């Protein structure tokens, strides 16, 4: 590892996104709104609250015009957030996360367009059909052949359902025990109580 790579290996999702946002030419207010959205992402990279709710929390006012303006700024900032890496970040649910990634593949020409379109249609259906791998019902919903439906399902399976996962610091989730018991020889020392299991 190079020193830079090692430092980035423990970079948080928030830091990663904020670093990318520095290259965007934004007004001070728009930069603040984007930062606010980034800081409200969960560990998986999802935005759990609605833009309206976030705007109300930030505005501190009941003035409808100010709230509408702030919601508009949040909408623009969310589009910018969706343009950052990892693809799918800022989604408000699994279906949207998958759709963002599929649209990215489509724009970059990294997958056959007809398969991506079928996958997008699948993601617009109730996701329990996909989870159950209900090919017949997905074929009906998409109007695609079995082969194309299966190809679309395979494409979806390759996507990252939790785009923030690689940034979660595993070390912070380690539980340190209060007591560690080790065996010293064949017998417990005389000063320790007997434990029966």
What feature does the model see in each segment?
Residues 2-197:
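Duplex nucleic acid-engaging cores and interfaces of nucleic-acid transaction enzymes
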